[in-house]
Amino acid sequence: IVDFMRSYSSDPVADFRELYRRLIFTILVSNKDDHLKNHGFLYVGAGQWRLSPVFDVNPAPDRNPHLETAILEGGAHDRSINLALEACAFFEIPAAEAREMIRATARRISDGWREALRQVGVSGGMARDYEPAFMSDQMEEALAV
């Protein structure tokens, strides 16, 4: 995806950062539906494309330790904040900026997941059932990175 964006995005730097945030988000919410068909592009004219809005994110409380799509082509499929941090250069993001993106995303998720569920009518026992999708060892690592 990054290679496509390098060649065809009208704003590759912004798209790299957005894709990296989505990778972090996928890890931190235990998204079980992270395959390549769930990344789209919108045509903006003159042979240029932009990353589409995010779609089809499915938090999974069972915390599958593997991603459907490897972080780097030919790489491990581990659901790992540390691997995401190691991959930041591929997204042309400096390590210090990647760490801040990881921490900020983790804070936003850990501070807001209960309210987000409440807003869509999920509360009580069902919300507690989803807690492992949002509060995990990867969340702890992300907050401390």
Language-model region placement:
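Anionic ligand-binding catalytic core segments
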Residues: I1-L36, G40-V145
